[in-house]
Amino acid sequence: FNMEYSQLFEQKKLEKLSKMHRLLGRMGVIKRDMLKRHTVILIADGLGSSVSIDSAMLYLKSIKYTKLIIATPFASVNTVDKMHLVADEIACLNVIQNFMGVNHYYEDNHIPPHSVIIKTVQEMVENWR
C-alpha cells in the first residue's frame, strides 16, 4: 500500500516543482541565457529525495551549461546516488541512511516569505552582470 502511493506522491511533487520552475523561468527570475556556458550551482538545505534534483534537471535540460555542482549539508543515500549521476561535482556533508525530513535537522525552521526569496535571488542575479 505504502509503496503504491509513494510513487504517485513523488510524481505529483515532481509535476508541481516542474510547474514552479516554468513559472519562475517565465517571470525572469533567472533567465536561461544567463546560465549558458557557466557553472551552475544547485544549493539545497537538505535533500531527502531526488524530486528537487529531477525538477532542476528539467529546467536545465535545454541549457548548455559548463558544469553542474550540487551542494547540500545532508541528503539521503538514494539522493546522493542521483547526485552522482547528474552532477559534475557534489558537496554533501552528511549522507543519512534514515532521512527524517529536512525540518528534523534544523533547530530554526523559519522559511522567509516568497517575496523575500525572489528579491534575494534577483539581487544576486543583478550582481552577476
Task: Give the predicted meaning of each segment.
Residues F1-R129:
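PRPP-associated nucleotide enzymes
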